Amino acid sequence: MNDQFNGSLSRRNGQSNAWLWAAAGLGGLMAARALLRRAREFDFKDKTVLITGGSRGLGLVLARELAAAGARLAICARDPHELERARADLAARGADVHVFPCDVTERAQVAEWVRVCQHRFGRLDVLINNAGVIEVGPVEVQTLADFEEAMRTHFWGPLYAILAVLPEMRRRRAGRIVNISSIGGRIGVPHLVPYCASKFALTGLSEGLRAELLKDGIVVTTVCPGLMRTGSPRNAIFKGRHRAEYTWFSISDALPVTSIQVERAARQIIAACKSGDAELIITTQALVAVKFNALFPELSADLRALVNQLLPAPGGIGARRAKGKESESALAPSLLTALSDKAAERNNEMS
C-alpha cells in the first residue's frame, strides 16, 4: 500500500515539476521577447519613409501620421494630380515630402523612384508597400486580366520595391519593410478572388522575407487589416451586378460594427513597425475570423460558401468594369455609408 502511495505521489510530483519547468520556460521566452522588442524600438524622427500608393486612402493617412512623428516622406502613385493634392496636404502639415509618379507594376519605374529617393535623402529607412487594387464580383465575371492586374499590384509591385531598397538597407544593416496585405491574404473571401489570391501571395512573400532578412538587420512586418474606413470603395472596381456589389461592399466598409477608422488603423501599423512586430491583424473581427478559420477550417469554408449564396448572382454588366462612383444605388451613398463617404472627402478619394 505504501509503495503504491509513494509511487502515485512521485508521479504527481514529477508532473508538477514538468508544469513548473514549462511555465518557467514560457515565462523566459516571454521575457526574452519583451527585451527583443525593446531592442528593436525604432524612432521615425528624421527617418526616410517610402510609401507606395501614398496619394490617397490608407497610404495618405499613414503619411500624415508619419509626418507628425518627424519622418521624411517619399510617396508614389500613378495619378500626378492626386499626388499633387497629397503633397499640398502633407506640406501644409509641415512635412518634408517628395512625390513621384510611379506605377508599381513597372519594375523600371519603381527602380527609378527608389534611385531618386536615395539621391535626395541619402538613406532609405522604411519601405511601406501599400499600393492596391480591388476588383469585386463573382468569379464568373473575373477575367485572367483581373488576376494578372491583382498579382502585378499586390505581389510583383512590392517585390520590385523590396529588391530596389535591399542593397542600401543591407549595406547599413538596418531597415524596416511593412507589407500591407489583408484579411483577404489569410482567408479566401467570396467575390474578391483575384484580390485574395494576390494578397495570399504577398503574405507568403512577407513572412518568408521576415525569416531571411533579420540576420541582415532588416525587420519585415506583415499587416493584415480587416475593413477600414478609408473611403476607397469609390475607386474600387465592380463587375457583374455592379450596383448591388457596390452596395454591400460600401455598407460593410462603412459600418462601425464591421470596420475601423482608418486613422486608428494607421497608428496601429506605425506602432507595429516601430516595435518590429512580425504580424499585425487589424480589427477584432478580422482576428476572430483568422483564429476561427485556423481552428475550424471546414466550418469556416462552409460559412463562406453560405455567404456567397447571399451575394449578388452573375449578370449585370458581366466582365465589364465600373468604378464605385459609377455604381451608386439607393442605399449607397446613404446614411449607412456616411462614415466612409466622409473619409473619402478627407483622404483624397473624391477624384
Protein language model regions, located:
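Conserved glycine-rich cofactor-binding loop
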Residues: T48, S55-R56
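Conserved glycine-rich Rossmann-like NAD(P)H-binding loop of the short-chain dehydrogenase/reductase
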Residues: A71-R85
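The beta1-alpha1 cofactor-binding region of Rossmann-like NAD(H)/NADP(H)-dependent oxidoreductases
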Residues: P80-H81, F100-E112, L144
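Substrate-binding pocket helix/loop in short-chain dehydrogenase/reductase
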Residues: P138-V139, T143-E148
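Active-site helix of classical SDR
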Residues: I162, S198
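Residue(s) in the substrate-gating loop at a strand-loop-helix junction
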Residues: S182
